[in-house]
């Protein structure tokens, strides 16, 4: 019912006996047939044929990034989800140009759902509250997560990152604002156990860096036999 029923009946023009695939966002999907469509309120009734349960990703890919402006936020989350992002945390930085608001999360969740549909990913990414860089580093100190930071001063090779990813249960990908991290923030980063990775010679937009970083790490995980 609700938004999904409207999309099915009016946008996709699905009718009785049409076949659909539905998912719950926590690993379960189902093949179903439309058995009835009622109006006021609009509801689409389904008959489930069979269920499938998909295990969670072997390695969680957690994007922690400064927010780009406006519609670029949705673009970033859309592409990141298609590439295998499992978690997202907005990062508050000294040079951030945008901040997450309560109503923003509702819009982001809709983007994530549509992206999972597009890419046939049965696990919906988890949205976390925004956090300061210093607090994030403190949170990571007690975990076994691998931290990879997009930075022009980092390395460019695969081997160092690939070695860190061996048997990793979670990898956190940090992307700062387009103005870069402040000197104070860089001091905090120096204290953290992390790998710096250069994504090119130019200054990338936040969403470009985030997507490039996820694609890079996802490829390494896949080549190691661990699907992103």
Task: Describe the residue ranges of each PLM region.
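N-terminal positively charged helical leader segments and presequences
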Residues: 1-53
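Glycine/charged-rich beta-loop-alpha catalytic/anionic-binding loops adjacent to active sites
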Residues: 2, 58-62, 170-172, 191-199
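Fold-independent oxyanion-binding glycine-rich loops
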Residues: 2-3, 25, 67, 130, ...
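Hydrophobic side chains in well-ordered alpha-helices
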Residues: 8, 73-76, 185
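RNA substrate-binding interface of SAM-dependent RNA methyltransferases
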Residues: 51-149
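Active-site/ligand-binding-proximal alpha/beta "capping" segment
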Residues: 147-186, 194-198
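Structured adenosyl-cofactor binding patch, chiefly the S-adenosyl-L-methionine
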Residues: 183-228
């Amino acid at each position: 019912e609700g938004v999904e029923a409207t999309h099915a009946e009016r946008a996709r023009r699905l009718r009785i006996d049409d076949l659909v695939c539905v998912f719950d966002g926590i690993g379960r999907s189902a093949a179903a047939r439309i058995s009835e469509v009622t109006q006021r309120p609009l509801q689409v009734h389904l008959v489930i044929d069979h269920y499938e349960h998909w295990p969670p990703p072997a390695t969680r890919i957690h994007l922690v990034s400064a927010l780009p402006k406006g519609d670029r936020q949705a673009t970033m989350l859309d592409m990141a989800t298609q590439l295998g992002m499992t978690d997202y945390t907005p990062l508050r930085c000294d040079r951030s140009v945008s901040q997450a608001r309560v109503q923003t999360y509702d819009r982001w969740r809709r983007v994530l759902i549509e992206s999972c549909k597009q890419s046939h990913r049965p696990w919906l990414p988890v949205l976390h509250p925004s956090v300061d860089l210093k607090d994030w580093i403190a949170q990571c100190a007690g975990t076994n997560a691998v931290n990879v930071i997009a930075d022009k001063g980092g390395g460019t090779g695969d081997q160092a990152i690939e070695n860190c990813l061996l048997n990793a249960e979670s990898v956190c990908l940090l992307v700062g604002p387009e103005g870069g991290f402040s000197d104070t923030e860089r001091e905090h980063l120096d204290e953290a156990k992390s790998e710096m990775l250069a994504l090119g010679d130019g200054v990338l937009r936040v969403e470009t860096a985030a997507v490039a970083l996820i694609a890079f790490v996802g490829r390494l995980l896949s080549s190691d036999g661990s699907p992103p």
